[in-house]
Amino acid sequence: MVSITLKTNRIFRSCLNLATNLKFSITLFIIICIVSAIGTIIPQDKPKEFYMNTYSLKVLGMPLWKIIQLLSLEKIFYSNFYLILLLCLSFSLFFCSLKSQFPYLRTSRIIKLNNNNPPTSPLHESKKIKYNNIASKNDSSCVQLVSQGYKIYTFDKNLDKAGPLLIHLSLILILLGSAIHAFNDFIAQEMIPIYEVSHIQNVISSGRISKIPQTISLKASAFTVEHENEKVVKQFITNLAMLNSKGEVLKQGLVSVNHPLVYKQVYIFQMDWKLFGIRVNYGKNKIYEFPVQKIEANNEQQWSCTIPAKNQSKLILIFKNMSDEFYVYDNNQNFLKIGKINTPQLIRNTYFTVISKISGTGLQIKKDSSINIVYTGFLLLIIGLVINHKGSKKRT
């Protein structure tokens, strides 16, 4: 039993020495940087078909997309390997702080002032004194002279010593926040038609223990577009409400790209929009809904809709962006006229009115439970760097 205990202690000390080794921490940091760079080069969380089409090149007789999936490079920031690296670096910084930074901060800088020629009556008590020639060199440092026999030391209790410790602590918080994000958070995208209620279903990425809120639903009551001019879109804005299972409003507000709706660490951003169809009135309250198809032309978002006309003919309506105007063509793609929403049209003996467009808002829903931890880490990192820089200038 004693030998087993000794071996266990040796193994523990070896692991502790390795964790507090500066070269080990730097090696881990370099590996994390390389892995993160790979994650930025290879698109993350894409459908399988995307990787099959993009990485069809064969390497050593195997398609590259299979190698990517085999090594989990398509979700590298959620892989076990990446999480283990983050945790190892966090533990390394933590134990290094306990072993080196705290004792360094506690003992401060020690300077031996006298070692020879012992005085006739040596001092035996510690005294805090104002020593002008020392204090002038150390600015606001608290200088304490301590006698020990015939030897006199100064303890320079300086705030500059806290810089490296704050940097270590900030890095630990940032890494811890990243690990929590990888385990507990999720990202989803939803395209919600206006006036309809939708649940969070289209999950793009999620952590191992993350839970998708099934009791929360989303309802978009309005969607508008702000323009800088007639052709340039400034931003999209959605009037969005979060509902509980009983249909009661939990939170409501305007959502845009830079102004999310936040509820219990769930952030909802405006991402995109889509046109689903149009409503057409043929008179006498005969209202029909027709789907639209998206087409690309001249770097503009356009939608095409075919509606029936008299004499078994058809009319083609083209909508551009979010404009209230539409272009009318016949079966042979001959341009007929420009119409407007809520304005009656009489074309080829067909009387109709386009009442409204059925649009939808594209939202990105993400849970970010570690954002406060990460922000605190970056704040401490800035403070630590400022203190460390100030201390280095003093010493020079």
From Swiss-Prot:
GO terms for biological process: cytochrome complex assembly. GO terms for cellular component: chloroplast thylakoid membrane. The chain crosses the membrane at residues 22-42, 79-99, 162-182. Its main location: plastid. Keywords: Chloroplast, Cytochrome c-type biogenesis, Membrane, Plastid, Thylakoid, Transmembrane, Transmembrane helix. InterPro entries: Cyt_c_bgen_Ccs1/CcsB/ResB, ResB-like_domain. Signal peptide: none annotated. It holds the Pfam family ResB. It is a multi-pass membrane protein. It is found in: Plastid, Chloroplast thylakoid membrane. The keyword Thylakoid applies. Belongs to the Ccs1/CcsB family. Required during biogenesis of c-type cytochromes (cytochrome c6 and cytochrome f) at the step of heme attachment. May interact with CcsA. This is Cytochrome c biogenesis protein Ccs1. It comes from Cyanidium caldarium (Red alga).
